[in-house]
Amino acid sequence: MLKHPTLNLLQQLGLAGMADAFTRLADNDESDNLSHGEWLALLLDQEATWRNNKRLALRLRNAKLHHPAVPEDIIRRAPREYDRTILDLLIAGDWIRKHENCAIVGPTGIGKSWLACALGHKACRDNHSVLYVRMPALLQSLEQARGIGSLATRLKSLGAVELLILDDYGLQPIDGNAPHYLLEILEGRYGRRSTLVTSQFPVARWHEKISDPTYADAILDRLVHNAHRLEMSGESMRRLRQPAEIQT
């Protein structure tokens, strides 16, 4: 079967969304009743949708979110105790546009990482670049980058992402070169980008997790000063969910 010349042109121009819509409309007898303007409007709408979906898929892939979490699922999960007003504010996402930070704290297994990933997913849908990383792994990778001479490049890339999710703050001591790395990240992001941190330790104990008090003061000033704080409590999700849904 020969292709319609218009379909060939759409494909040659890389207008995949319009090409797909053209094929479906051409196969639909009811489309004969549409005016030229209505045809064009439908094709353009499908192209815009296709491009938006493609960009979203790319942002989600680059975000490397640890959990397939979305904010719409929050109310369907096991009961949690938290400030709903703060959670609604975080989901709305204005804090990211204002380059503010977020701290989510609570006991192990409460679902902090899952919630952070849900907020990350929403940020991707809001056209923000996102990156999820566990803090112990991040600090280790920065030490390795220093060893091969790519530390500056790595720090620059971390400074560019619009929402950086640092999971498991304080799980391991922040010592050696780690305080310097963390300060460099936050200094470059403060007032320019947003950082979301999760921790099983209350914010009041974050200072003691950093070996150098001077660095600790500087780090927390940039991290906590403009942060929205969400404290979670409740039963561990590890006791409530099957292994495939284990949370941290």
Curated annotation (Swiss-Prot):
<dbReference type="GO" id="GO:0016887">
    <property type="term" value="F:ATP hydrolysis activity"/>
</dbReference>
<dbReference type="InterPro" id="IPR002611">
    <property type="entry name" value="IstB_ATP-bd"/>
</dbReference>
<dbReference type="InterPro" id="IPR028350">
    <property type="entry name" value="DNAC/IstB-like"/>
</dbReference>
<keyword id="KW-0067">ATP-binding</keyword>
<dbReference type="Pfam" id="PF01695">
    <property type="entry name" value="IstB_IS21"/>
</dbReference>
<protein>
    <recommendedName>
        <fullName>Putative insertion sequence ATP-binding protein y4uH</fullName>
    </recommendedName>
</protein>
<keyword id="KW-0614">Plasmid</keyword>
<comment type="similarity">
    <text>Belongs to the IS21/IS1162 putative ATP-binding protein family.</text>
</comment>
<feature type="binding site">
    <location>
        <begin position="106"/>
        <end position="113"/>
    </location>
    <ligand>
        <name>ATP</name>
    </ligand>
</feature>
<dbReference type="InterPro" id="IPR047661">
    <property type="entry name" value="IstB"/>
</dbReference>
<keyword id="KW-0814">Transposable element</keyword>
<dbReference type="GO" id="GO:0005524">
    <property type="term" value="F:ATP binding"/>
</dbReference>
<dbReference type="InterPro" id="IPR027417">
    <property type="entry name" value="P-loop_NTPase"/>
</dbReference>
<dbReference type="GO" id="GO:0006260">
    <property type="term" value="P:DNA replication"/>
</dbReference>
<dbReference type="InterPro" id="IPR003593">
    <property type="entry name" value="AAA+_ATPase"/>
</dbReference>
<keyword id="KW-0547">Nucleotide-binding</keyword>
